[in-house]
Design a protein with these regions (language model features):
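Beta-strand-dominated extracellular/periplasmic modules and repeats
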Residues: 2-236
Length: 236
């Protein structure tokens, strides 16, 4: 559906380089998308990472834990990720396309570029797509990812995390961030997460665990603009 002039969402005008990430092997160098406004709490940018899915992922494919519908499930702890995407006025954003990708329970990505010694799970797909409904909500099911060593760096284990990519009407670039899990000790020493100086902004990337009768459920809401705008990387 074409957008009207009033539907086009404003983009921030200031950018801050991310030189600290330039030295991280395997990560795409990006620039921060930083709002020019003063924000009370800012959810920080996160890098796209080296293992963006190389397969075609179909809209509606929200299950990361099985390669085929109804097929064998990947091993590990089942999880559900839910959330809402809103705009600058707090209005839900319908029709936004969300892509996610993550490692398996052993910390291995389903990607040919992952040459680590972590165990492969043949039933693990590890990526998916969803389109937000009229209320701006999305949902994924999968397996909680494991930690893994960052290639080329001694004693650096990346905490469990999920990569997010968001496309929405009126946004000229896809928006990239990462979701982390609460209660993970590696969160406290991860150079990427702790490269965010503002404590409140850093905490905004950690999902909130909710009660569920079917397993672990994590909430990760995304704000595209406004005073609580989520910050993202722009892929260069």
């Amino acid at each position: 559906m074409p957008t009207k002039p009033d539907d086009v969402l404003p983009h921030p005008t200031s950018f801050v380089s991310t030189e600290r990430l330039a030295q991280i092997k395997g990560y795409v160098l990006n620039e921060r998308r930083t709002p020019a406004r003063n924000l009370p709490v800012v959810t920080p940018h996160q890098t796209i990472g080296p293992f963006y899915p190389h397969h075609l992922v179909r809209p509606g494919d929200e299950d990361l834990a099985a390669c085929d519908v109804g097929g064998p499930r990947a091993e590990g702890e089942p999880m559900e990720i839910v959330g809402t995407i809103t705009d600058l006025s707090g209005k839900p954003v319908a029709g936004a396309l969300i892509e996610v990708w993550t490692a398996n329970a052993h910390g291995k990505y389903s990607h040919p570029a992952d040459h680590s010694s972590q165990l492969i799970d043949p039933n693990f797909k590890g990526y998916g797509r969803a389109i937000t409904g009229p209320s701006g909500t999305y949902r994924f099911v999968g397996i909680k990812p494991g930690a893994y060593p960052n290639p080329g760096y001694d004693n650096w284990m990346r905490p469990p995390h999920v990569h997010f990519s968001v496309y929405a009407a009126g946004v000229m670039h896809r928006l990239i961030t990462q979701m982390y899990f609460p209660g993970e000790s590696l969160n406290d020493i991860d150079p990427i997460l702790n490269g965010i100086d503002d404590l409140a902004a850093r905490a905004s990337l950690i999902a909130v665990e909710e009660k569920s009768d079917t397993g672990r459920r994590y909430r990760f809401d995304i704000v595209l603009q406004g005073e609580a705008e989520t910050q993202f990387f722009i892929e260069r």
